[in-house]
Amino acid sequence: MERTLVLLKPDAVQRRLIGSLVARFELKGLQIVGMKLVHASKELAEKHYDAHRARPFFPSLIQFLTGGPTVALALQGPNAVAVVRNLMGLTDGAKSPPGTIRGDYSISVQNNLVHGSDSVDNANQELALWFKADELISYQGCDHNWVIG
């Protein structure tokens, strides 16, 4: 089963969208195998967004992610990375189609509510940044055969 990291960023937490957003992932059939509320340190945020370090928006990205609590989710399911990215929508909420998280709840590029890993390799690296191995719990839900088939 594939795993991916999802962050419900500080704007999602402040807007009290946690329950609504988590429900969208669960209703799609993804399984939560890890979940916690974190106030990201500057060090964690910089490691997480290291690929953007040379970009001009890097400082504001770090300031945003460290500016309030974030919900870190480890989700599991078939093609979890692609499924999450489709549910999230485009980075720019104003251009994201209705029916996606960003299309329904965001009009910003930076304050776009969620982060999702963009590849399986990055998902593994990001999950290791945000979760200890013993914080990820594998289990088979009673609806497994109905959702996965």
Regions found by a protein language model. Name each.
Residues M1-G149:
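Non-catalytic terminal and connector segments of soluble metabolic enzymes
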